[in-house]
Amino acid sequence: MTHQVSVLHQDKKFDISLRPKGLREFCGQKQLTERLELFLHAAVQRGEVPGHCLFFGPPGLGKTSLAHIVAHTVGKGLVVASGPQLVKPSDLLGLLTSLQEGDVFFIDEIHRMGKVAEEYLYSAMEDYKIDITIDSGPGARSVSVDLAPFSLVGATTRSGMLSEPLRARFSFTGRMSYYSDEDLTTILKRSSNLLGIDADTAALYEIARRSRGTPRLANNLLRWVRDFAQMREGNCINSDVAEKALAMLLIDDWGLNEIDIKLLTTIIDYYQGGPVGIKTLSVAVGEDIKTLEDVYEPFLILKGLLKKTSRGRMVTQIAYNHLKRCSDNLQSLGEEK
């Protein structure tokens, strides 16, 4: 148990050490970051607290990093909360009253807030006021309490699940997209410099193009390649070493992993290529529906390997071609041996 806690602590330190401190260090999402820089600096120049910000998109693209950057840019504190933990007004009360003027209040997975807590947040966002109920029973009375002006930053992987009243209270909204291989390579160069990893550009590009357009995954794979090189290759990290390390994780040259392949082959082998419903697919693959929808499907759809129809999921011809190529490659490797 102690070892597990230690590993988790190391993972957290690893993530924090690589987090960009400002927008100039944040690679990718150029249109979004240009708008955000203008939005924040204009407010700072006027001596005002910036308006509330909402960032949405797939997991691992840097929404939490942007929340930290907002706080760093305005030079104030950051208070962090998670949507699922905010169910009732009392869950918000202590957090909101502890905020100092200009602080950033970051709510991750904001779409998972309880409805009652969400409605309690409306007046805090709009008027910097909340109502507190004093006493109970017939003598109960409501008192309005002023809050210090603050900026709320919300992050969500499912913007469609946000209510319209909540969404309308955000002055700035930014959709985060998957990163290009080139941007990920730049991110990995920065990460390798910070971590003291000696890897050539070709190796970093091999990692980048297998990272599903996601910086968090790219940095995790960089760490794995570092460990592999340390134990098997005398700390040498070139493209060949990167390929070997990633092959050990069963990640192909498109970034598809074991679950991706299983999902596609299940549809092909058992459901004639589809369509098949998401509930049936979840049982067949052994992954919960939310994980399939949030983690695996977006990338497969982006790559043109999977399509969603009104009748269910279907595999595309591109998927058939890719899986055949992977099979041929494995066969040729076996013949070489």
UniProtKB/Swiss-Prot annotation:
Question: Which residues does the annotation say bind DNA?
Answer: 308, 313
- Which InterPro entries does the entry link to? AAA+_ATPase, AAA_lid_4, DNA_helicase_Holl-junc_RuvB, P-loop_NTPase, RuvB-like_N, RuvB_C, WH-like_DNA-bd_sf, WH_DNA-bd_sf
Identify the residues that bind ATP.
18-19, 60, 63-65, 126-128, 169, 179, 216
Small ATPAse domain (RuvB-S) as annotated region, ranges: 180-250
Gene3D superfamilies given in the database record: 1.10.8.60, P-loop containing nucleotide triphosphate hydrolases, Winged helix-like DNA-binding domain superfamily/Winged helix DNA-binding domain
Q: Which UniProt keywords apply?
A: ATP-binding, Cytoplasm, DNA damage, DNA recombination, DNA repair, DNA-binding, Hydrolase, Nucleotide-binding
Location within or outside the cell: Cytoplasm
Keyword Cell cycle among UniProt keywords: no
Per the record, what are the reactions this protein catalyses?
ATP + H2O = ADP + phosphate + H(+)
Assembly and binders: Homohexamer. Forms an RuvA(8)-RuvB(12)-Holliday junction (HJ) complex. HJ DNA is sandwiched between 2 RuvA tetramers; dsDNA enters through RuvA and exits via RuvB. An RuvB hexamer assembles on each DNA strand where it exits the tetramer. Each RuvB hexamer is contacted by two RuvA subunits (via domain III) on 2 adjacent RuvB subunits; this complex drives branch migration. In the full resolvosome a probable DNA-RuvA(4)-RuvB(12)-RuvC(2) complex forms which resolves the HJ.
- Domain text from the record? Has 3 domains, the large (RuvB-L) and small ATPase (RuvB-S) domains and the C-terminal head (RuvB-H) domain. The head domain binds DNA, while the ATPase domains jointly bind ATP, ADP or are empty depending on the state of the subunit in the translocation cycle. During a single DNA translocation step the structure of each domain remains the same, but their relative positions change.
- Cited function: The RuvA-RuvB-RuvC complex processes Holliday junction (HJ) DNA during genetic recombination and DNA repair, while the RuvA-RuvB complex plays an important role in the rescue of blocked DNA replication forks via replication fork reversal (RFR). RuvA specifically binds to HJ cruciform DNA, conferring on it an open structure. The RuvB hexamer acts as an ATP-dependent pump, pulling dsDNA into and through the RuvAB complex. RuvB forms 2 homohexamers on either side of HJ DNA bound by 1 or 2 RuvA tetramers; 4 subunits per hexamer contact DNA at a time.
Family recorded in the similarity comment? Belongs to the RuvB family.
This chain's protein is named: Holliday junction branch migration complex subunit RuvB
